[in-house]
Amino acid sequence: MKMQREHVVPLSTQVVALFKEVGELTGGGRFVFPSVRTKLRPMSENTLNAALRRMGYSNDDMTSHGFRSTASTLLNESGKWSVDAIERALAHGDADTVRAAYHRGAHWQERVLMAQWWSDYLDRLRVGGQVIPLDRAG
């Protein structure tokens, strides 16, 4: 985890099912997505980016970190979740050091609901739900 801080993530029912499926394929282990070189380390961001390039996406189209940006944008735009819960879900620190010293809430219950909502949202898109393009200019 970034900055070597523990980050606990609530899992939706869909993600739990996917992890079980992946575990059956990989034989389980410490990492859901281990490095291709050793099971003792996680898969690198470069490996994910290389996979995106092989799928035809340029760096301008998408990067692995871009998935986090997309999630942040869509979660914020939904109007359903507090900014604090979204930032905690993404393991972002607070730039305001005074606020960070006093605001240590995990927003756990909201993040549990948000994780399930996000998986349900992606499921709807996968089966043909309406996709609204975001204006890159603003």
Model-identified regions with their sequence ranges:
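Short, mixed charged/polar active-site loops
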Residues: 4-8
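C-terminal secondary-structure termini that scaffold catalytic or DNA-interacting sites
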Residues: 1-3, 13-17, 21-29, 34-40, ...
